[in-house]
Amino acid sequence: MMASAARALLARDLRMLWRRRGDSLQPALFALLVVVLFALALGAEPQALAKVAPAVLWLAVLLAGLLALDTLFRGDAEDGSLEQWMLAPVPLWWLVLVRTFMHWGSSALPLLVATPFLGELLHLPHEQLPVLLASLALGTPLLSLLGAVVAALTVGMRRSGILVALLALPLYVPVLVFGAGSVAAAAQGLDPTGALLLLAAGLVVALVLAPLAAAAAIRIALS
C-alpha cells in the first residue's frame, strides 16, 4: 500500500514537473548565476577562486533549494490535495517523505550532477571534488528535510516566501558549516571524516523526525 501510494505520488509529481519544466530549471539556473557572479566579483585569479570555491558551491546549492522551498506543499494546499493526503489509507508522514524526496531530486540532484562543471568555473582543485560531492550528497537531503518542516509550518499562510527563508536559514547554517568545512579540512590536509559523519548523523535523525514534524504541522495548518 505504501509503495503504491509513493509510486502514484511520484508519477503525479513528475507529470507536474514536466508541465512546468521551465520552473523546474530555475534552481539550477539560479545556482549557475550565483557561481558566475562570484567568479566575476573575485576576478580571474585562480588561487582566490579555488580558496572560496567549496563555500561558494555550497552556498549556491543552499540558495537554489531555498528558492523552490515555498512551493513544496503550497500547490497541494491550494487544490485540496493535502486534505486528500490526510484521508489517504497511508500515513501522512510517508507522503511528506515522498514529496520531500521529489523536491530533492528536482532541485538538488541536478546540481550534484553539475557540480564538477561548476567547480571548473571556480578552479576547484580536483582532489577536493570527491569530498565536496560526498558532503553535498549527505547535506542536500538534510536541507530538503529541514525545509519540509518549515514549508509545512507556513503552508496555511499567504505570501510566506520571506518567512520561509527567515525560518529555514538558521536551520541551514550548521549544514552549511559542516558541509563546506569538510572540504576546507581536506584542502588543509586534515581528515574530513568527522564533518561528514556529523552530516550523516543529522541526515539519519532528520529522516526519522522531519517527516513526522512536517505531517503534524500540516494537520495543525488544515485543522
Residue ranges and their predicted role:
Residues 66-86:
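Transmembrane helix boundary and interhelical loop/hinge segments in multi-pass membrane proteins
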Residues 204-223:
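Junction motif at the cytosolic side of a transmembrane helix
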Residues 133-152, 204-205, 209:
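Hydrophobic alpha-helical transmembrane segments of polytopic membrane proteins
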Residues 1-27:
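Aromatic- and glycine-rich beta-strand/loop motifs that create alpha-glucan
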Residues 53-69, 73:
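Long, hydrophobic alpha-helical segments
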